[in-house]
């Protein structure tokens, strides 16, 4: 069964442009009748009749509206560049939040308004990213820079054309498509203009939240640097050369376009732009793109937090005494630090007002909840329910965070660089001070540990390594980013730290406990106050890390894993050497590009 009504945007948003009915009223027989009648009463009647028909007419009006007769600059551009059929498809450009709510509720299965006012949407079969289906077009302008391999698999220009044509063909079958224009990057010198062309209102609202929203006057003549064609509801042809499934997420740096087929997971658009910035930043502007959160103290001191999922990146950067620059994606340039995004994309599984009040309160009108379970009567969301996925999310404008710094940038260079890890073996110190080579080694390693599921019978934690804490999104070789980071740290005299939010006293398997959040926050406070830089340090063997002998607010016995260990000396030696070996094994694939001092900065087993 098709749509109950044809929905498109009204082409008569400009009051100066007369709609056909108004044109008939102002000329022709009807107009003569009105003009020849001098009765004020009759004039009022005709005026009231017009108002009744045209005031407050929304997209849900039974008569619907049709594509523009006189095409806009934006429509002409889409028609010329992508052959969007603007005579058949209504192009809804930069719609309001309210109209996107209406469209999502009427046309998209699984959408609803929750009790907090947020829109909830269902992303379909795919509830997370599809990294194995990511492709980069292999073409002359970028092929010598790209880090080819499992992360960036090549796609031929011919296959790109097939997939792009398939996406555009699908978009041309829709009654309406949405266009969202915005910026990636808060620094005007380095930002890129992004256009999203999609078929789902949920996707449009998501990217409206995640991109930086331009003033209305800047949208009138907006010309994108990069365009995303999201036809995620339509599959790729899995028999096309190089396709591994019916899902395809492809980026063409020469054409400055991205095409999505076979996945409706909105995060693919966000992370696609992130990959673009990982390429454009270093290659075009010599700026460093980072998978990090960032905040700023009252004196303007900036801290960057790197970390994989579950290490505390979002939690620790949310500090009542510091302003949030951003929670996920940043660039470090010669002009300071800036956020790439205009919004936040927070995990919501297990969310509560007590644990994360800022995120909880940001879930309101204008926000998009993704794949959550809610009570159909009360519309209250059960954030503990992972029936659809563990990866439940919410996208909201960064303005919804009370202590966000708007604009989201700082002219100051970072004073502290914090590499977060969650070591479930309990053998990494809660805090270590890193030198330049160690910073590069641990940045490239990107270590954390994930707890094994009980169903597979494995009791010990699983080591996870993600280069630069961002491996799925990298465009260039990790060493290129690591060298840039080391240079910037050296040039701006930044302090680098390895902060373990994982287990202390013993590992997870030996009955240890996770480091209390109050101690982790005390460590951060000592870093920000400068106290931790001035205490006495000792060398921690195997990993050769500099560990403080004391830290305000933290028991001294917890600072060195060897002295804190409660599960027997033999088990400690076994665990620390085992983890050291995993680090060395993982780093082998980067040794050909690494300098001798960086290789030697790893563990000595």
Curated annotation (Swiss-Prot):
Extract one GO molecular function annotation from the record: ATP binding
Which is one Pfam family of this protein?
PEPCK_ATP
Coiled-coil blocks:
none
**PROSITE patterns on file:** PEPCK_ATP
Which pathway does this polypeptide act in?
Answer: Carbohydrate biosynthesis; gluconeogenesis
Which HAMAP family does its entry note?
A: PEPCK_ATP
Q: What is this protein identified as?
A: Phosphoenolpyruvate carboxykinase (ATP)
**Organism whose genome encodes this protein:** Neurospora crassa (strain ATCC 24698 / 74-OR23-1A / CBS 708.71 / DSM 1257 / FGSC 987)
């Amino acid at each position: 069964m098709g749509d109950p009504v044809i929905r498109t945007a009204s082409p008569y948003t400009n009051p100066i442009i007369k709609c056909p009915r108004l044109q008939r009223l102002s000329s022709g027989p009807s107009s003569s009748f009105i003009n020849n009648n001098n009765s004020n009463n009759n004039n009022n009647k005709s005026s009231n009749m017009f108002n009744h028909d045209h005031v407050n007419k929304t997209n849900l009006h039974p008569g619907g509206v049709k594509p523009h007769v006189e095409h806009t600059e934006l429509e002409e551009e889409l028609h010329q560049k992508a052959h969007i059929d603007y005579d058949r498809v209504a192009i809804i450009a930069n719609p309001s939040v309210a109209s996107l709510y209406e469209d999502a509720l009427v046309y998209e299965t699984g959408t609803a308004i929750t009790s907090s006012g947020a829109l909830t949407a269902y992303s379909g079969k795919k509830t997370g990213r599809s990294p194995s289906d990511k492709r980069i077009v292999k073409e002359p302008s970028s092929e010598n820079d790209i880090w080819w391999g499992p992360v960036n698999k090549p796609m031929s220009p011919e296959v790109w054309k097939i997939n792009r044509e398939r996406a555009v063909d699908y978009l041309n079958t829709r009654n309406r498509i949405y266009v969202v224009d915005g910026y990636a990057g808060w620094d005007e010198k380095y930002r890129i203009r992004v256009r999203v062309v999609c078929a789902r209102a949920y996707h449009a609202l998501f990217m409206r939240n995640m991109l930086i929203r331009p003033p209305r006057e800047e949208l009138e003549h907006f010309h994108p640097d990069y365009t995303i064609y999201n036809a995620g509801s339509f599959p790729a042809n899995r028999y096309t050369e190089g396709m591994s499934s019916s899902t395809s997420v492809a980026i063409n740096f020469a054409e400055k376009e991205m095409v999505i087929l076979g996945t409706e997971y909105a995060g693919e658009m966000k992370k696609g732009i992130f990959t673009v910035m990982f390429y454009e930043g270093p290659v075009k502007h010599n700026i460093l793109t980072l998978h990090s959160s960032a905040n700023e103290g009252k004196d303007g001191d900036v801290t960057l937090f790197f970390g994989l999922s579950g290490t505390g990146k979002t939690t620790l950067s949310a500090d009542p005494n510091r302003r949030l620059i951003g929670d996920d994606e940043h660039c470090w340039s010669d002009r300071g630090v800036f956020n790439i995004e205009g919004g936040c994309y927070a995990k919501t599984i297990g969310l509560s007002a007590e644990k994360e009040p800022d995120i909880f309160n940001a879930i309101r009108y204008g926000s998009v909840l993704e794949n959550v379970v809610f009570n159909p009567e009360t519309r209250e969301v059960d954030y503990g329910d992972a029936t659809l996925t563990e990866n439940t999310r919410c996208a909201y404008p960064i303005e919804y965070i009370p202590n966000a710094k708007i604009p989201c940038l700082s002219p100051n260079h970072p004073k502290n660089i914090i590499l977060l890890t969650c070591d479930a073996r309990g053998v990494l110190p809660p805090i270590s001070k890193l030198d330049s080579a160690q910073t590069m080694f641990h940045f490239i390693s990107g270590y954390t540990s994930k707890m094994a599921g009980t169903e597979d019978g494995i009791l010990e934690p699983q080591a996870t390594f993600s280069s630069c804490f961002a491996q799925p999104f990298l465009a260039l070789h990790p060493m290129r980013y690591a060298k840039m980071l080391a240079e910037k740290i050296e040039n701006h005299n930044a302090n680098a730290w390895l902060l373990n939010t994982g287990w202390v006293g013993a590992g997870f398997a030996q009955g240890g406990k996770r480091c209390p959040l109050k101690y982790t926050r005390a460590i951060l406070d000592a870093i920000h106050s400068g106290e931790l830089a001035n205490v006495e340090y000792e060398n921690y063997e195997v990993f050769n890390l500099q560990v403080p002998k004391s830290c305000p607010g933290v028991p001294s016995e917890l600072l060195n894993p060897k002295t804190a260990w409660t599960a027997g000396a033999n088990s400690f030696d076994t665990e620390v050497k085992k983890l050291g070996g995993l680090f060395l094994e993982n780093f082998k694939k980067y040794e050909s590009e690494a300098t001798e001092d960086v290789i030697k900065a790893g563990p000595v087993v």
